[in-house]
């Protein structure tokens, strides 16, 4: 413990394990209870039995009536109450000092760094970390136990005080116990002063009980806050990524949008027909006719037209525009479809429609097409 001696370390340890409410309670108990009982209660109750007068000459009647009126001396009862209530705090303080001295004998200890807390080491309480990172032992559980005992003792002595003495000292006390004959009236000395002292000590006891409850609640909340949470692995934090973005997708730094992969090129379709359609749109007339013998010629002319197309045109635009306004885009889509599917090179001639022309007209059209 560099720069801190044994006494200073013990004081720091005790100070860190006692809350502000506990310190206020200690001051209240020592000043307002013990000093008032010793300095003010003793003169008031010193001659209590001598001044207790009964209106009878029967021997022993006054002593019996005084025993009924005050089975226990008020002064002794309050002294026992104060000592018993202070006893749990004294035991806790001795325990803390003993453990602190044991820790000091082991040598200087430091609080672990924040990066070491994930490995399971106990973190020092934030309110107990002094300059230099001095580690102070935590006795929160023992402090809560001592508070429970102290509060129970306070409540028990309060109930017993009410059963024995009540709240006020009476002016006279009727007594019917033998050897008294009939009802005997006994008179108490200084009843007003005793009543004021009793009310003051009742208020001190109530305040002590409320401070004990408040200290207990604060200590429980502090213990819950000090409880360490589950450690978070660095790999889990890296995999979680930025909030609002799904895992595995990179984020564009400039626009903040997700980068989408290039879409798969769509399959070119001729005139909206399927992959197995044997129809190809004509360049001149739009009639669908492909004879068996001219399949190779159509394929060669389509490859020439594909070679003439400008290379700067995007593939997506050429593939997604099957209804082009010119007559050059329609024949180009069909040969590309035929080239992509080799099984379509052997196309069966479709059944001639009812409005089809004759064989001579077909030959003339074929010669013009070539």
Swiss-Prot record:
<feature type="transmembrane region" description="Helical">
    <location>
        <begin position="197"/>
        <end position="217"/>
    </location>
</feature>
<dbReference type="GO" id="GO:0007267">
    <property type="term" value="P:cell-cell signaling"/>
</dbReference>
<dbReference type="GO" id="GO:0005243">
    <property type="term" value="F:gap junction channel activity"/>
</dbReference>
<keyword id="KW-0303">Gap junction</keyword>
<keyword id="KW-1003">Cell membrane</keyword>
<feature type="topological domain" description="Extracellular">
    <location>
        <begin position="41"/>
        <end position="76"/>
    </location>
</feature>
<keyword id="KW-0812">Transmembrane</keyword>
<feature type="compositionally biased region" description="Basic and acidic residues">
    <location>
        <begin position="246"/>
        <end position="260"/>
    </location>
</feature>
<feature type="topological domain" description="Cytoplasmic">
    <location>
        <begin position="218"/>
        <end position="370"/>
    </location>
</feature>
<comment type="similarity">
    <text>Belongs to the connexin family. Delta-type subfamily.</text>
</comment>
<feature type="topological domain" description="Extracellular">
    <location>
        <begin position="168"/>
        <end position="196"/>
    </location>
</feature>
<feature type="transmembrane region" description="Helical">
    <location>
        <begin position="77"/>
        <end position="97"/>
    </location>
</feature>
<keyword id="KW-1133">Transmembrane helix</keyword>
<feature type="transmembrane region" description="Helical">
    <location>
        <begin position="20"/>
        <end position="40"/>
    </location>
</feature>
<feature type="topological domain" description="Cytoplasmic">
    <location>
        <begin position="1"/>
        <end position="19"/>
    </location>
</feature>
<feature type="topological domain" description="Cytoplasmic">
    <location>
        <begin position="98"/>
        <end position="146"/>
    </location>
</feature>
<dbReference type="GO" id="GO:0005922">
    <property type="term" value="C:connexin complex"/>
</dbReference>
<feature type="transmembrane region" description="Helical">
    <location>
        <begin position="147"/>
        <end position="167"/>
    </location>
</feature>
<dbReference type="InterPro" id="IPR013092">
    <property type="entry name" value="Connexin_N"/>
</dbReference>
<comment type="function">
    <text>One gap junction consists of a cluster of closely packed pairs of transmembrane channels, the connexons, through which materials of low MW diffuse from one cell to a neighboring cell.</text>
</comment>
<feature type="compositionally biased region" description="Low complexity">
    <location>
        <begin position="331"/>
        <end position="345"/>
    </location>
</feature>
<dbReference type="Pfam" id="PF00029">
    <property type="entry name" value="Connexin"/>
</dbReference>
<dbReference type="InterPro" id="IPR017990">
    <property type="entry name" value="Connexin_CS"/>
</dbReference>
<feature type="region of interest" description="Disordered">
    <location>
        <begin position="227"/>
        <end position="370"/>
    </location>
</feature>
<keyword id="KW-0472">Membrane</keyword>
<protein>
    <recommendedName>
        <fullName>Gap junction delta-4 protein</fullName>
    </recommendedName>
</protein>
<keyword id="KW-0965">Cell junction</keyword>
<dbReference type="InterPro" id="IPR019570">
    <property type="entry name" value="Connexin_CCC"/>
</dbReference>
<dbReference type="InterPro" id="IPR038359">
    <property type="entry name" value="Connexin_N_sf"/>
</dbReference>
<comment type="subunit">
    <text>A connexon is composed of a hexamer of connexins.</text>
</comment>
<dbReference type="InterPro" id="IPR000500">
    <property type="entry name" value="Connexin"/>
</dbReference>
């Amino acid at each position: 413990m560099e720069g801190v001696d044994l006494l200073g370390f013990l004081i720091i340890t005790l100070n860190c394990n006692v809350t502000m409410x506990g310190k206020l309670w200690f001051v209240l108990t020592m000043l307002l209870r013990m000093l008032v009982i010793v300095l003010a209660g003793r003169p008031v109750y010193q001659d209590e039995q001598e001044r207790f007068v009964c209106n009878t000459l029967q021997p022993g009647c006054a002593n019996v009536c005084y025993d009924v009126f005050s089975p226990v001396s008020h002064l002794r009862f309050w002294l026992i109450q104060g000592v018993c209530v202070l006893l749990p705090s004294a035991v806790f303080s001795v325990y803390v000092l003993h453990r602190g001295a044991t820790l000091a004998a082991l040598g200087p200890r430091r609080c672990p760094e924040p990066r070491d807390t994930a490995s399971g080491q106990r973190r020092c309480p934030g309110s107990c970390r002094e300059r230099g990172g001095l580690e102070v032992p935590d006795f929160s559980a023992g402090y809560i136990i001592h508070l429970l005992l102290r509060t129970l003792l306070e409540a028990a002595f309060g109930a017993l005080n009410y059963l024995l003495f009540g709240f006020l000292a009476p002016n006279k006390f009727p007594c019917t116990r033998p050897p008294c004959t009939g009802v005997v009236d006994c008179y108490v000395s200084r009843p007003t002063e005793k009543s004021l002292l009793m009310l003051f000590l009742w208020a001190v006891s109530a305040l002590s009980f409320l401070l004990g409850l408040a200290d207990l609640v604060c200590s429980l909340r502090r213990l819950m806050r000090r409880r360490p949470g589950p450690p978070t692995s660095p790999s889990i934090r890296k995999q979680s990524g930025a909030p609002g973005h799904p895992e595995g997708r990179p984020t564009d730094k400039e626009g903040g949008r997700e980068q989408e992969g290039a879409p798969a090129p769509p399959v070119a379709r001729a005139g909206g027909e399927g992959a197995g359609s044997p129809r190809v749109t004509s360049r001149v007339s739009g009639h669908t006719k492909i004879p068996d013998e001219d399949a190779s010629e159509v394929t060669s002319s389509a490859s020439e037209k594909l070679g003439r197309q400008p290379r700067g045109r995007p593939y997506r635009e050429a593939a997604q525009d099957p209804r082009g306004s010119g007559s050059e885009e329609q024949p180009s889509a069909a040969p590309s479809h035929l080239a992509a599917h080799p099984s379509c090179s052997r196309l069966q001639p479709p059944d001639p429609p009812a409005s089809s022309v004759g064989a001579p007209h077909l030959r003339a059209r074929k010669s013009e097409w070539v």
